[in-house]
Amino acid sequence: MSSIIKIKNLTFSYSAEEERKTLDNVNLEIEAGQWVALIGHNGSGKSTLARCIDGLLMPESGSIEVDGLHLTEETVWDVRERIGMVFQNPDNQFVGADVEGDVAFGMENRGIPRAEMQKRVKEVLEAVDMTAFAKHEPVRLSGGQKQRVAIAGVLAVRPKIIIFDESTSMLDPEGKRDIVGLMRRLNDEENFTIISITHDIDEASLADRVIVLNDGRVIDDDVPGKIFASGDLLTKIGLDLPYPEALKEELKEKGIDVPNEYLDEEGMVDWLCRSALKN
């Protein structure tokens, strides 16, 4: 599969006085249709990298290519047409008086004909299960519902890539499950390229690939099973382990033999059930 994002020797600083770079010689490629999770502690460079990919920040050196376009000041608006971003606080993205008006806003800016806009608003509200709230004011929605509306607004302009920048961090557990499930569906069924920037290790474990950033550098890049099976790396940089791995560590401390390979929650439950039957 071809790479939809190519980043070479990317360097960025917020000021010349910084002792270290916010992004320091980052190199990576992301394939079309992948769900990639970017993880790292606060200040590791995750959100800065996302903003560079979208052209909200311009790197001081290196190059970014998105869907065959080299990102420059001349091409930035063409690049942004290929990318949708969903931020941590959806209130900062709302501009419409009601839900359907907010979803339509991005299309209005692109000059999409009214009949086509109405068609897309209906389609994307159905896709995120928010049709019943079309006439509601966004401020009166729950956190999870607000994020669904923000996602609908992104879907309406039909990008190829969706970046979720800490989009679940302010949600309750139910809202978080809903949005992560929607990410999965958009990736599996609609083939969107998903980039999820998150502190939630359990969310990251559901991605196709996990990239670990620390102090502006990529320090690991692999499938979730291999990243989380080597838990020492994560704990050294201040990250938690996914729940199944944390449970395995507790069982080890009690002298119980556990599998070496990474287990997701379903795999952990299966292993516990088999172990109980043997005993």
Residue map of PLM features:
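The feature captures the beta-strand-to-loop junction immediately N-terminal to the Walker
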Residues: I39-H41
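Helix-to-loop junction immediately C-terminal to a conserved catalytic motif
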Residues: D54
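Conserved ABC transporter NBD signature motif
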Residues: G62-H70, V79
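Conserved ABC ATPase "signature" region
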Residues: A115-F133
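Conserved ABC ATPase signature
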Residues: E137-L141, Q145
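Catalytic Walker B motif of ABC-type/P-loop ATPase nucleotide-binding domains
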Residues: I162-D165
